[in-house]
Swiss-Prot record:
It is found in: Nucleus. One of its GO terms (biological process) is mesoderm development. GO terms for molecular function: DNA-binding transcription factor activity, RNA polymerase II-specific; RNA polymerase II cis-regulatory region sequence-specific DNA binding; RNA polymerase II transcription regulatory region sequence-specific DNA binding; zinc ion binding. The gene is zfh1. Keywords: DNA-binding, Homeobox, Metal-binding, Nucleus, Phosphoprotein, Repeat, Zinc, Zinc-finger. This is Zinc finger protein 1. Residues 42-57, 158-168, 253-264, 707-719, 857-866 have a biased composition (Polar residues). Residues 133-157, 222-249, 274-283, 427-437, 564-576 have a biased composition (Low complexity). Involved in the development of the embryonic central nervous system, embryonic mesoderm and adult musculature. Its main location: nucleus.
Amino acid sequence: MLSCLAPSSSRFGQEDTIIQQSMPSTSPFAMQFPSLASTLLHHNQSPKHSNPGSSGIQDAHPNQPGAAADAFLVKCTQCHKRFPEYQSLSEHIASEHPHDKLNCGAAQPESDAEDEQSNMSGSSRRYAKSPLASNNNSSTANANNNSTSSQSMNNNSELAKNHNSANKMSPMCSPGSLTPGDLFAQLQHPPPQLPPHLHAQFMAAAASLAMQSARTASSPSQQQQQQLQQQQQLQQQQQHQMAMQQLLPPQLPGSNSSVGSNSAYDLDLSAPRSTSSPGSTTGDLSGAYPCMQCTASFASREQLEQHEQLHSPCGPAAVSNVSQTCRICHKAFANVYRLQRHMISHDESALLRKFKCKECDKAFKFKHHLKEHVRIHSGEKPFGCDNCGKRFSHSGSFSSHMTSKKCISMGLKLNNNRALLKRLEKSPGSASSASRRSPSDHGKGKLPEQPSLPGLPHPMSYFASDAQVQGGSAAPAPFPPFHPNYMNAALLAFPHNFMAAAAGLDPRVHPYSIQRLLQLSAAGQQQREEEREEQQKQQQHDEEETPDEPKLVMDIEEPETKEMAPTPEATEAATPIKREESREASPDPESYRSSSQAIKQEQEPLNVAEERQTPVEEHAPVEHAADLRCSRCSKQFNHPTELVQHEKVLCGLIKEELEQHFQQQQATSFALASASEEDEEDEEMDVEEEPRQESGERKVRVRTAINEEQQQQLKQHYSLNARPSRDEFRMIAARLQLDPRVVQVWFQNNRSRERKMQSFQNNQAAGAAPPMPIDSQASLTREDQPLDLSVKRDPLTPKSESSPPYIAPPSGEALNPEAINLSRKFSTSASMSPASISPSSAAALYFGAAPPPSPPNSQLDSTPRSGQAFPGLPPYMLPMSLPMEALFKMRPGGDFASNHALMNSIKLPDYRGTSLSPGGSEKRSWRDDDSRISHEDEFGAGVLMPPKPRRGKAETHGHAGDPDLPYVCDQCDKAFAKQSSLARHKYEHSGQRPYQCIECPKAFKHKHHLTEHKRLHSGEKPFQCSKCLKRFSHSGSYSQHMNHRYSYCKPYRE
């Protein structure tokens, strides 16, 4: 509220009349306007503000020269600042105290020094800014000010009047304070009679005393509340000012406002100013610094600069709600860490991200990341789920789908039952093989499988809608086709299918199937893993094998050949029997690992015998396999790529040789009497050396896989000495890391082959049988033959790389040649393949045509005991004590092979294991080449020496300059301990990629890389972590997981 009204200078000399006539003399009025009379009477006492006519007032009051010095100054009740006139006070209240007009709190007193300082500063500013104000127009200004004051505070004045009329007290006083009338009533003597202007001052002093007494009487809690109210009002005022600054239109720097001033009453008062209520936004409080990008303006430059950061793309993080922004591409990020990761693409893209995409501007650190990114543009999705059919372009997405239970089948771990499902699909009638279990398996938490009854339909018949035909009984109506894996999973979960059929329930929709499926996946997981391993071993033995495999199946105890009849009738009758006996005598090697698996040995032969009852039908080609047959030689292949390679490279050579030498091929009968006698002697010696523990024990065959490197070493030993002693057998076995018995049997089998070759050549020279037609010979090339890797072979015969043509029966028995040699594993021929010719056999092949120089005292032994080996070639000789250096000169590209085109075309290190058939997977590991010691220099003198200490894997290759690494690469500084390692290393420099993927255009240098790559297309993951059950398609990924992540990978939980 206003404490006084400013007088008008034009009313000079009439103040008493105005006071007495127009203003009431009650005490409330005197309290509201305490200094009204003094300011009206002594307004012009100051000499610098007085008119010439003011001397009359001074003469009229000569006794009060100093009383009027401060009487005409108006003081604000809120901040106690003094102003010379009402206009300045009203402007001050409107600008500085817009919210305090209704404040009933008492004002704090101010010291005299502060009063004088504020008085001088206020008067100087006022008269410096408004010099046009004079006494001549003071009446007009007074009228304008009064009207302005009444208009600006009409709401507050009305509320104050109502409050005063209701409570009969001053609005500046607290409700519990004393009024001046009450204060006068407490006095013993009435106040003296004073002149009007002194009486007004006296009343003002009494009012101030009343306020002080009320302030002292008020409680501390009320003071705290008043302070809190003042703080809230100050905060509201600041918020209001900020809102006004943002909403006000911009002003140019030359506007009518004081530059650099923060106070509203310091502005030019000549400009129009709104005096509306505090909630109004129409007041002109705009600053001198407007924003050029929006309509906001600010009073200081600092505020403007802080505001302009909101519009800047590179604003700092100190500004609220401003994200991190890249200074180069102006991309915004949520936090500084993402910005730092993004800046790598700008700062280090030239060094780290070398692989750039041609379709977009992205770059990658690794090439395989770029390859996976390119699939996004091309739409290629090489990874497919076998269970739901969904395909993926990234291997990570595919792995996440298969392992995170996004696919219901994988989430239920149906992948473990895949081998069993395939067997159900292939053999619908034989469920005995699927239900093979040992008695020890039961009782370990494993669920036994129930074979399906013969009268019930096959589970897969639901998809063909022929359940009634196969089952022979009424069945429910066929349902829509389900995915086979889903269907089989449900059938496996329901162990008793006959119960569902008898009850008229379909296992696909029975709710018990899913529950049973969950139990099966949890309880039978280990059982499925063991079964799958067993089936894989069994399939490897059952499937047809190509001669390209670096594996030789050895027989510990060969069946006596006396039992074989030489006549075709006996051969035909003995075929299934011998095959069953051989299968009975050959359980898996894993059956010897534990006692529980050993019990399976009694059950397995019977089941295998049932599967082998029709061997001819089993080897019959599949219907779709007719397309994978060679058009020239009618040879059957397992893979389209192998067929194309055969027709382009190999088959033409074979056809030319067949046309030139088909008259030399004759089908003769077998005369194995002498060879059988010698075999008996060898076996009797073996039996004497190792007597059998039980006379009633049947013969047991142990299959031993010998890789190609071991075969080469064995052939080298055999070429030096075909009949080594027992100690020499042990030395050879120790060097090759084989069992001595295996090495001994290998030598024995090679001697047996040589004797059979000798008998066959004798009968061929005598002309015992008429020549065989070319058709029967062509049919012979696609049948099973025993492996032969050590004897001399005729390069002109189509079967020379695997075995000599001695097992061709005279009468149409070429379809079943297994009765000739039933004691070893058969393999499918793949025609003349350079990959199957070893260096020693290739050297022996051409040794007779170009005999090398030999030592003068060296004793050469003729391998054939009688007759010629081949009619078209001179007799060949195998050296007994020839140094290994001489043998290596006969390798492809050597001195003795320079005149032979076929031998020069052989590149053994480049084409080992080139078969692409599923059955011809390479079993040799590159680790064997790196870790195995070279034996070339050990047999220089033809004597078996004590074994050398083996070199570690890390020592088999290094850099040039190492005396232990004599083989240095001429294209880099690497050195190797073996010539074979250097040859394989040079293959890396050649840039050749002969192994082509048929699914995509990728090609690889090594076959094992192609084998692992194919798993990406098939989805096969043969490697699994035993802890978290995560599966891997690559052995490298599996090794990395087991070596680095196995310690902290999370265990799998159902």
